[in-house]
Amino acid sequence: MRTHYCGQVNSNNIEETVNLCGWVDRRRDHGGVIFLDLRDRSGLIQIVSDPERTPDSYQIAGDIRNEYVVQITGRVSRRPEESLNPKLPTGEIEIYADDIQLLNGLGKQLPFQVSTAETEAVREELRLKYRYLDLRRERMTRNLLLRHEVIKAIRRFLEDEQNFVEIETPILTRSTPEGARDYLVPSRVHPGEWFALPQSPQLFKQILMVSGFDRYYQIARCFRDEDLRADRQPEFTQLDMEMSFMSQEEILQLNEKLVAYIFQKVKGIDLPLPFPRLTYTEAMERYGSDKPDVRFGLELVDVSDLMKDSGFKVFSGAIAKGGIVKVLPIPGGNDAISNVRIKPGGDLFKEASEVGAKGLAYVRVKEGGKIDTIGAIKDNLTDEQKQELLKRTNAQPGHLLLFAADDANTVNKTLDRLRLVIGEQLGLIDQDKISLLWVTDFPMFEWNEDEQRLEALHHPFTAPHPDDINDLKTARAQAYDLVFNGYEVGGGSLRIYQRDVQEKVFEAIGLSAQEADNKFGFLLEAFEYGTPPHGGIAYGLDRLVMLLAVEESIRDVIAFPKTQQAKCLLANAPSEVDKKQLKELHVSSISKAKS
């Protein structure tokens, strides 16, 4: 039916006859000649229908409306000089229609305009309900084609240049919770027993290392029943990788080359290698975050030792309870940030309180290095402490110093949030800049206050640092995250590959030997049969593509995403099912209460 895609026709095809198919993006009637913008996934091209050349086709063109599906046969011609459109890849040419076939029209009025000429925003709920229309729009088509190019680049690099093998792992597996709730699938054949959809291919890819497939990768579908945010979905896609006989350094270097390859092929950008690195401790101390956006400054300064003996009880009291005091120095903050914004009711106070802060303290640096404030800080600092504060923060006249005092977790969350908000508001973030860095040496465990136990910071299969093996509770993990402009886009580690070490880690997180054997016995047994040292990484593919596409939500780079309420508006899922189906599965449903 067609010889070319719309966006493929160019000046090299002048005088050729082509067959094109697609949707009418826009129709314009100019003095008896009708112009149609024909669109397919490759782009737009202008069609000219002249009644003097083809009266029958002109009649059809007169009845055509936006989003009609048509087939065009016509001759490629150069546009008149005054009609050239340099903004359009096909802007040098147009097609004089010899024949127009109407393949399909519209049975209903469009719920929103699809045309590339439309700039009016459409509600996301409407876009998701009519996703097939939304995906015709230029922006969404561009995003999905970008996603395709990213995956194509991944496969080419890993297979052609690095000798990786793509292997699929099971979708129906056993429930081995890894931090989030599992999606469960009842077994009809085994009444009372359940499969789970995988949160990741973690266990199976480690089994593949035992099996001798030393370089594995997979574009893997993963499922987590968790509360949703802008960058989370109940089902998502990972680039999953695992490698045997490689050190952490070798894994990081290989992945830097992979990411650089993707950027070069997809964006035409050459990334400098190697990527910068921060330890977890350095990242938390300087930025208050393990995924810092380092495109701008505003680094935090710990002043706990300076404030522990101050007369300001908010600070000294927090330190006495084992907390810390940190300050966020803001150049030009005196003029840019008013007192009202920092006090209760102000926008910065609200931002801080959302992450647990009880309040904010601040001082302003005036001419001559004079510290000015409303409150008790100034009056409870000695001249020596004031001078040391100015020295540590490198504060100059015009600086605003924002303080947070509480437990370390709350302080870091508070100042991390404020750093990002203020950096954005003051225009300090270069939106065109690309910042990639590794964060390494994470703690093995973190304390779960609700359950009063240790839990793995990443997952319990992460290998401890060899220097810390005798004290697992405070051990560093041989783990690493890749951070892209303040987003974690990849995370991995060297793995435990000895049964006794794995059992010690299970014990540290409160798993009994029986429970560990019940959940992970097949992995522990595999470790008895010559397991090689191995490690890996998984990338959040949706998030990576989101950042490459300069979008704000992963829903805009997924063909058929769920809403933040975990619903598919297109298919109206999830839905109730027939009682007969439930009976076959040996499952009964507890109906939700009617309001």
UniProtKB/Swiss-Prot annotation:
Presence of keyword Cytoplasm: yes
Gene Ontology CC: one annotated term: cytoplasm
EC top class, as a word: ligase
Superkingdom, natural source: Bacteria
Protein residues bound to ATP: R224, D225, E226, Q233, E488, G540, L541, D542, R543
Compartment(s) where it occurs, according to its Swiss-Prot or TrEMBL record: Cytoplasm
Catalyzed reaction equations: tRNA(Asx) + L-aspartate + ATP = L-aspartyl-tRNA(Asx) + AMP + diphosphate
EC number: 6.1.1.23
GO BP term, example: aspartyl-tRNA aminoacylation
Stretch list, region Aspartate: 202-205
Swiss-Prot/TrEMBL keywords: Aminoacyl-tRNA synthetase, ATP-binding, Cytoplasm, Ligase, Nucleotide-binding, Protein biosynthesis
Annotated binding of L-aspartate, by residue: E178, R224, H458, R495
Transmembrane segments: none
Keyword Transmembrane helix: no
Molecular function GO labels: aspartate-tRNA ligase activity; aspartate-tRNA(Asn) ligase activity; ATP binding; nucleic acid binding
Matches recorded under InterPro entries: Aa-tRNA-synt_II (IPR004364), aa-tRNA-synth_II (IPR006195), aa-tRNA-synth_II/BPL/LPL (IPR045864), Asp-tRNA-ligase_1 (IPR004524), Asp-tRNA-ligase_1_N (IPR047089), Asp/Asn-tRNA-synth_IIb (IPR002312), AspRS_core (IPR047090), GAD-like_sf (IPR004115)
Site (Important for tRNA non-discrimination): H30
One Pfam assignment: tRNA-synt_2
Family: Belongs to the class-II aminoacyl-tRNA synthetase family. Type 1 subfamily.
Described purpose of this protein according to its UniProt entry: Aspartyl-tRNA synthetase with relaxed tRNA specificity since it is able to aspartylate not only its cognate tRNA(Asp) but also tRNA(Asn). Reaction proceeds in two steps: L-aspartate is first activated by ATP to form Asp-AMP and then transferred to the acceptor end of tRNA(Asp/Asn).
Description of how the protein assembles with itself and partners: Homodimer.
Name of the protein: Aspartate--tRNA(Asp/Asn) ligase
Organism this protein belongs to: Trichodesmium erythraeum (strain IMS101)
